[in-house]
Amino acid sequence: MKKATAKLLLFFFCMSFLMVIPKKVNAAEIIPVNISVKYGQTEGRKIFDMINEMRTDSFDAWCWNADNETKTRYDNLNELAYDYDLERIATKRAAELALLFDHGRPNGESFFSIYEEEGITYRAAGENIAMGYRTAEAVNAAWREDGEPYNGQGHRRNMLNPKFNCVGIGHVYLDGCHYWVEEFAYRTSVNTTETTANDSEQIMSLSVPKSKVTGLKVAFDKTSYSLRTGESTEVKLTAKLTVF
């Protein structure tokens, strides 16, 4: 079973909230790869209130400055709205993390590209990702980075960024490991139409460069089959792809 890795190795963060990142040109052949993931949105949505509790608490709403001696305190931050469009892309990104744990997507593009792909407009965006934490409380505590210096508080700055007005959270489970995503944005039109939390098991089709499919293992349901001349039998095969 995978374990939660030390934060310096586990987490990455995007600092360029307002930067327009051009779509990456990739000549590699892209193929679909299907993976079966278990969604955990009931648990994932618990983080929403935790974010707003930190944003509106005068004691908690702070970050270190680069000198690690003085703090920026965020007074009168607005609560974020929960955006169900952002949740949709956060859950897809969480599934992608099971293939490639990075802000870059398995198809070779930046995470920003999923906004265009899903037709979601925004003026600013940021993303927090994590893996290995079993509960909403545990991953939120890691993202808060209370005890980290300035260089280790990128996720915290995302959570407290006054330029964001909404968030969506994604959580999936695969092969004994939990994957979590927070998608932050500033949007002029926030989708607050509530949907039922998805806790089902579903097959996701993800785009991957063909060159990243590095192996194929096929397993039979039996080690041997005994047949007489003219007889037939049903053989069950299980195929497993190795990606990245």
PLM features: residue spans?
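Bacterial N-terminal signal peptides
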Residues: 9-20
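Short, well-ordered surface patches within globular domains
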Residues: 28-118, 156, 162-167
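Short, solvent-exposed loop/linker segments at the N-terminal edge
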Residues: 225-232
